[in-house]
Amino acid sequence: MRSPSRLPHETRDSRQRTPKTDMRGLYQRAIKESFVKLHPKIAVRNPVMFIVWVGTIVTFLVTLNPNLFGTVQANINQQRLLNGLITLILFFTVLFANFAEAVAEGRGKAQADSLKATRSDTIAWKVLPNGSLEKIGSTQLRRGDVIKVVANDMIPGDGEVIQGIGSVDESAITGESAPVLKQPGTDIASSVTGGTRLLSDELIIRITADPGQGFIDRMISLVEGAERSKTPNEIALTVLLAVLTQVFLIVVATMPSFVNYIANFISTAFGAEAANSLRAGASIAILISLLVALIPTTIGGLLSAIGIAGMDRVAQFNVIATSGRAVEACGDINSLVLDKTGTITFGNRMADEFIPVNSYTVEDVARIAKLASLFDETPEGKSIVKLAEKYKILADVNLNQAEGVEFSAKTRMSGTNLPNGKQVRKGAVDAIKGFIRSRGGSIPSDVDVAYERVSLLGGTPLAVCQDNEIFGVIYLKDIVKSGLRERFEQLRRMGVKTIMLTGDNHITASVIAQEAGVDDFIAEATPEDKIDVIRNEQSQGKLVAMTGDGTNDAPALAQANVGLAMNSGTQAAKEAANMVDLDSDPTKLIDLVTIGKQLLITRGALTTFSIANDIAKYFAILPTIFGAAGIGALNIMGLKSAQSAIISALIYNALIIPALIPLALQGVKFRSLTADQLLRRNIFIYGLGGIIAPFIAIKLIDVILPFS
């Protein structure tokens, strides 16, 4: 097989972009799914709506044969008409509940379709052990295979760059048009995702996932999980609704016996006609209407939609949640563990000043700093070289004979071993002090003065040395992102504690923490400290959220109740987390807490509204059953007739479900209030509103209906 330097462009898929949801098509599919969900095996999953489903079947049967459960006391044709109307309204009640769930599911499936569009059946060039290339289909690739990708070709699978540097277009996944530079040697920049496109140069990639197990495949399976497992709070609420439904079912089931008892008393006191009128008011269809009106059908019909919509709102932030449990956990978070760099401050710290110590000059510091940064390709390292060049410093070193020393979290320094045997280093001040002492050197007193000066300015001090002598301190300027103080204050009002982790010294960390407005901070933190902080918070009964992108973050991401991994991060980090941010913006963790709380607030608000509705429906239907028993005074709405009261209450009960679908999908407007303030506000708006709204609506429907 030939080994061309430029491989032929043989993908069978053109560049894809995430499409906008086709709302018309979404609603058409949702209407179709509403009928599919009428299947008993699907309907039984929602106990509240299943009662309505069974009630619809029963009222349909008594429409066909009004005497099915006993002789009808009223006019049989009028009874058949009433039964038919009740059946129709109950049918649409179930259909509207199915539609709400189908719309929420459809939005998730639309996202899955957009992710599927990034997958393409591509040709891969596999690098054989002898160095030659073999053309195979991407589905034949296996974990550990090495492939070659060139400019304009689609990357056929998830992998790690082991050779080459190139720009990759990840817009099909992230929506971000700016290309991302990929190169070997770092956790972040070496990770590539199948379905993205290489824009320039060539890359040698080692495949890290078998077909069907890549990042996109896993995300699709998660997003398509319409049959998702319910969250603990959702299960608890479902159980509560089921218990309420059973209570009302027992009450309504015993009502015929109670009515017969009263009818016998009325027959003796007022005659048989009054007794028969009372019995007619307790027909099977009317009792089912009372049951449907009393059970919490509104929240029962919207509960699944609220949960699915919560995941969809997260997806609109370009974040993939592995489960509804993760989204819900965001709302219960008590502590946020945040990295300083990239989350609280902008990621790229820039060299701003060289501060000489130990009688050296600024030029001396610039020269040593530049030598220590010759192999440092980070933005910080490049900014040090750029600042040194302002002093006309030339690095007269043969790079082929010099040796770069990479930064590590353990040593907390990097540098260069020069051809003449000298060692130049830059790094955290205490790390450089340790390096000097290990070589028998001494620490000049003005190092601490420079250290404190930079720290008090909120910058990061890096010491530079050659062998056993410190030459000076580099001032790396760090800028806190705007608006964070206000957002942290909002979180504080909601009872969420913010903890900043940084490798900076205590003074610098204190200045940054005060400027950003975080509640607590850990200075000179190592990656291992993250998991210790999380465990400490969890031992106090708190739920913890954190972000991470590197392999060393994976244990902490797995330990956290909510772990948000960056899409630009390593495969290990993404597998350990329960959320992945496609935009790789760690600040989004704050937004996710808001979304989680909004989900819980929406569920609670609509539950309150649904249960409060029962009061008005109670006063609409109950007087129609016991009117002959002399409790017509309970008809406080002045409804025209028994038939009008029943139909009005059921129409309202059905229409309120589609009316609340937008609120269920978009969520209740979030306000950063304390738990007590939120409770009082929701009881006032959705509790009191849930009582008043049906009184008004049922009366208006009664006025419009032609019953007399």
Curated annotation (Swiss-Prot):
Keywords: ATP-binding, Cell inner membrane, Cell membrane, Ion transport, Magnesium, Membrane, Metal-binding, Nucleotide-binding, Phosphoprotein, Potassium, Potassium transport, Translocase, Transmembrane, Transmembrane helix, Transport. Belongs to the cation transport ATPase (P-type) (TC 3.A.3) family. Type IA subfamily. Its main location: membrane. PROSITE patterns: ATPASE_E1_E2 (PS00154). This is Potassium-transporting ATPase ATP-binding subunit 2. ATP binds at residues 376, 380, 407-414, 426. One of its GO terms (cellular component) is plasma membrane. It is found in: Cell inner membrane. The chain crosses the membrane at residues 49-69, 84-104, 235-255, 283-303, 619-639, 645-665, 683-703. The system is composed of three essential subunits: KdpA, KdpB and KdpC. The lineage of its organism: Bacteria, Bacillati, Cyanobacteriota, Cyanophyceae, Nostocales. The active site is at residue 339. The gene is kdpB2. The keyword Nucleotide-binding applies. Part of the high-affinity ATP-driven potassium transport (or Kdp) system, which catalyzes the hydrolysis of ATP coupled with the electrogenic transport of potassium into the cytoplasm. This subunit is responsible for energy coupling to the transport system and for the release of the potassium ions to the cytoplasm. Its EC number is 7.2.2.6. It catalyses: K(+)(out) + ATP + H2O = K(+)(in) + ADP + phosphate + H(+). SUPFAM superfamilies: Calcium ATPase, transduction domain A, Calcium ATPase, transmembrane domain M, HAD-like. InterPro entries: ATPase_P-typ_cyto_dom_N, ATPase_P-typ_P_site, ATPase_P-typ_TM_dom_sf, ATPase_P-typ_transduc_dom_A_sf, HAD-like_sf, HAD_sf, P-type_ATPase_bsu_IA, P_typ_ATPase. Mg(2+) binds at residues 549, 553. Residues 7-23 have a biased composition (Basic and acidic residues).
